[in-house]
Structures are given as structure tokens and as C-alpha cells.
Amino acid sequence: MSQEKQVFSIDLAGRQLTVETGQLAKQANGAVLVRYGDTAVLSTATASKEAKNVDFFPLTVNYEERLYAVGKIPGGFIKREGRPSEKAILASRLIDRPIRPLFADGFRNEVQVVSIVMSVDQDCSSEMAAMLGSSLALSISDIPFEGPIAGATVGRINGEFVINPTVEQQEQSDIHLVVAGTKDAINMVEAGADQVPEETMLEAIMFGHDEIKRLIAFQEEIVQAVGKEKSEVKLYEVDADLNQAVREMAEKDMHSAIQVHEKHAREDAINEVKKRVIEHYEAQEADADTLGQVNEILYKIVKEEVRRLITVEKIRPDGRKGDEIRPLASEVGILSRTHGSGLFTRGQTQALSICTLGALGDVQILDGLGVEESKRFMHHYNFPSFSVGETRPMRGPGRREIGHGALGERALEPVIPSEKDFPYTVRLVSEVLESNGSTSQASICGSTLAMMDAGVPLKAPVAGIAMGLVKTGEHYTILSDIQGMEDHLGDMDFKVAGTAHGVTALQMDIKIDGLSREILEEALQQAKVGRVHILNHMLSVIAEPRTELSAYAPKIITMTINPDKIRDVIGPSGKQINKIIEETGVKIDIEQDGTVFISSINQEMNDKAKKIIEDIVREVQVGEIYEGKVKRVEKFGAFVELFSDKDGLVHISELALERVGKVEDVVKIGDVITVKVIEIDKQGRVNLSRKVLLKEEQEKEAAKEENKQEQQ
């Protein structure tokens, strides 16, 4: 590859995309700087010279955010970036998924792909720039990568598809789709949608693939100009004689073990065959490399037989038909003190979801590179080791947990009521209690149940299902509700979530080339049938959201004040609002438009806080009548508190009908008297009169007396 800087350009969605090579990070195997509008991402690819002694392909993909890219200094004492944000983790997964299948089987050299986001233009996606950059860095390097790949974001506005929509366009779009693949096939889809029909989603995927083909042709030109020759790498292979010997020893028993229907019994039967074969070679004092090869051969025997049974004989490991859903069971309200809970069980997969309602001040604050500053709906997914009967250290959420949590969040977000209709922050936590495939979709179903139990007025209930595909030659089988073994050994993992009306989320990963539109269409339609079946089951448990919130959920009341009065409610350095909070124990959130949200478990305290705020912002009007308490007495009159922090003066001449010599002769401190506002002077001082009301009362009495006499 030439070490001189070279620049290549293409138009992408009406904005220029340029690729620079030969100037930055020249010690990496491959490096490119991708500029898209004002977005700039440096992508690099490096690989170890020797293969690693592992039984998998050690690929790491990192998408690194730098806050200088948006002119921010990180918060906290350290003032530097810490652990990756959730968005960065999701972007890393997004890039990893289409790249990983394009390395040869048996390639065991460690590969690291790093994209550093150096400048961000919000209208020009840094994730898409990083995906293109990652593919190009690998493609122009000497690493044996079988790409390139490319990705595109697709939106839909007023029925028209849009490539790489701007921030403004995204707000109008009812589809948020990321599709990636090679020039021949799609191998990754990640999408959120507002109950969009399956046919429309398929059209959007194909629309995105047309753009991908153009971007790949652009990459191929760059590779032709500056690409290095690919390294000759020895791929991991098992010994042919050993392969034959192990197969003769294990195939028959392994085929029988695979057809045991129950998961744990099947695993025990397979492990028994493996143990017998391994012990045979250990007795012959086989070295670690040979034992590793034996394990690899045994794994391939299982994979080949499972795939053959599914595609040729149409037999699934647990005996189900291709479109059959595992037995379903659901329950709500099983945790008394939580705001809402839902238990969803599908075969040997079980998720317990809990819904917690909070005030709007409980929103998650986002400190990243995007324009979004907070979010009021969250879904968190936990996958403890006991869910698969294993022991493992208990650590924080990994990439998988964050990815599954985000998928559930994306699936449910379109049906969450607006802040205006439901002024609560909603947090969902899904605890996976048992796992045998499709746990992310079980968490979506459990979360829907939990929110309905909590009384969240969902626009529509959502269910999710994981579809699979096994393709051998011309034979293929689409599987509904895949379990762990089918996911691991199959060719496609296609998760579809949505309502009875349409799709709200899609996630698809494909391990093979040449997946036709017809197969995708069939998979989507089969998924719809399964999804509706699951929804009907869920609605048989709880038909609609509860009409009342939990007694333990915060009660929220909303009021509107003049925006000019916000500072009066807050007070200097927050003194006034903190006083209200201390006195009532409520939470208070104030929007810039003057909307005030008051929340606490105690409705009485909410009402008290509302009354205090009403008094603070209340405007005194001439002619209004108040019942107030005498707060101070002076020689010239009495000061009366009309409402909180608002006093007026009753001059001595306005205290009574007769002449008053001493104020104390009529009122004293603590007396409650009725007064009328007669004037507000230029300085805002309020002048009151008791005499006016007494005179009015006197005139009424006189009129009554006169009427009485006339009637006599």
C-alpha cells in the first residue's frame, strides 16, 4: 500500500463522504479516516502474526467515543472518558455482527478493529462512518478478510424511504432501520418501527441493500488503488485420520443423543458420548492439541446431525414442528410491593419483568455524543449464570446484556404513552430466570405484562419471537421460537417484536451468503403468526392495563404556571422549592413552558404542595376578596397575609365604618379578617379595605329591611 496520503470521495444521501488513507496510524495493518459531512472517524485494523491456541475466532471490535468530538469536557473529578457509554457498546456490536461472518472457518489469529470518533456532525451518522471505516481498514490491510461490507440507515417519511436521515428527518420517520451486508447479501439488520407492516419492513431492507451495493463498489475502488496483498494464513484443521476415527467411534451414539427432547437430558446424553471418546484418547496419552481436535470433531458431528434432521427430516431437537411455539405460561402481580410485575415462561425460557414508575426527575441523564440529553423509558436486562445452571462470577452487565436490554427498549418504546398523557418515568428490569433460547423476546413479553399490571396505558401490547433458519444446499427450514441449540447451530437468528398491527423491532444476524428475499418474506410472515399466538396468550392473562396504579407507586399531579413565575417557585438558590419539598416530602419537576409535576406516594402531600405553589404564583387582582391573617400591626394600619408570602396593608382609615383611634381597638395580631383589594400601586404594594366590605354588608342589610317594610 502506498504511504502517501490519498483521498477518495462519494456522495451519500446528499452529503459528501471522503476516505483518507496513507497519513494516519500507518503502523496498523490497515487504517482509514472517514469524513462524512463534519463527522470524522479513524478506523484501524490490526492482527496477530500467529494463530492463538483457542477454539474460536478472537475478534474484538471497539467503537470509541471521545467527548472532544462534540466540544465537551467529561464530567466528574477525573475529567477523562471512562467506561464506554451504552450507545458506544451498541455501536461496537452493530459493527462486529456483519464483519464476523466474513472470516474463514479455522482462522484463529487475533484481530482488533478500533474506530475512534473524532468529530461529530449530528446529521451525519458516526456509526455508519465507523462501519464503512472498519470494513475498509480490514479490506486494504493484509488481514484475510472476505469483505468488504457496508451499512446504511433507512427511514420512512410520508411513505417515502430515506437513506441516512438527518436528525430532523428521524423525528418524522416511523422506521429506524440499520441494514448491513455484502454486495450479494444482507447479513445484519437492526430496526425499530412504529407498528409498521412486515411487507414495508422488507421493502426498507431491500432499499437499504441497494445503497450498500454502491458503497461496496466505492470500497472496491479504494482497495484496488491502495490495498495490500493478503497474508497467507494457515487455517486450523483437524487431522483427517483422527476425524474418521472419532466419527466411527461416536457418530451413531451421538445421533441418538441428539434426539432426546428435554434440554438437560439431551445435554447429559451428548456429554456422556463426548466423555467416553475423550477418555479413550486420554488413555492413549493424547496431547492437548489432539484432545482439542477431538472436541472440535465431536462439535461438528452434533452440528451436522442437528442441521440434517431439521432440513431433511424436518425434526427439531425437542420434537416440535417448524412453526410450533413451545408451551406458554404467564402470571402478573406476583411481587406485592413493586409497581407492576410479569412472569413469562416459554418452554425452558423464563423471564420475570418488573415495572417501576418514577417522577419525571428520575429520567436517565445521557452524557454522550448524541443530541438526546435524557430518556424517560428504560429497559434493563439481566442474565445471571443460574439461568443456565452454571456458576460464574457476578459482574456488571456485559455487551450482550446491554444489547438485549436495548432491543427490548426499542421494541416497547413505540407503545409507551406520551409524557403529556402519562407524566411518569418508566423503568423495566427483566431478570432471566431460565434460559433455553429467545430470552430477549421473553423479556419483551414479560415487560408488556409488567407494564399492564402497573397500569401503564400502553398504546398496544407487544410480544416478541425469535425465528431461525437452517439451510443445507437447496433444502431449508424456517423455525419459529428457536431454542438455544437451534440458535447456536443454525444459519440465522431473526428476532421480531411487535403488536397485532405491525413490527416495532427487528434484529437479524445471518451466518450464510445468498439469503433470498423470498426466504426473508416467509420468515417475517411466519413470525407474525407466532407473535399473534403469543399475544393472544398474554391477553388471556391480563386483557388491558389496570385502571389504577399500585398503592406504592407515586401519585403525580400536573399544574401549569406562568413561565415568568418559575423563578418565584424556585426562589434564590432553590431556597423556596427546597422549603416546599422539605415541608411536604414531594418531588417537584418544572418544565420551561411552566408545566409543574408534583409527585409522592401521599396524595394529601401532593395537594398541599400544589396549594403552596398556587399561592406563590397567584396574582392579586383589584376587586378580589380574601380572608387573611393579621401578621403585623403599626400605628398607621394592619398588615394582612392574603396567601403565602403575599401581604397587603389595611390603612387605619379602612379598618371600620367609624373613625378608629387605635388599630389595636379593631384588630390584633393573629386575627382572621375579610378584606377587599382596592388598589395595587406602581411599586406593587397592595392596599386593602375592611371598611368597604362592612359598608357593602350594611347596605345589603338596609336594602333587606326596606324590602321587608314594603311587603308589609
Curated annotation (Swiss-Prot):
Record InterPro entries: ExoRNase_PH_dom1, ExoRNase_PH_dom2, ExoRNase_PH_dom2_sf, KH_dom, KH_dom_type_1, KH_dom_type_1_sf, NA-bd_OB-fold, PNPase
Family, similarity comment: Belongs to the polyribonucleotide nucleotidyltransferase family.
Domain KH: 554-613
GO biological process, one term: mRNA catabolic process
Domain of life: Bacteria
Name the UniProt record assigns to this protein: Polyribonucleotide nucleotidyltransferase
Location in the cell: Cytoplasm
EC number(s) per entry: 2.7.7.8
Gene3D superfamilies: GHMP Kinase, N-terminal domain, K Homology domain, type 1, Nucleic acid-binding proteins
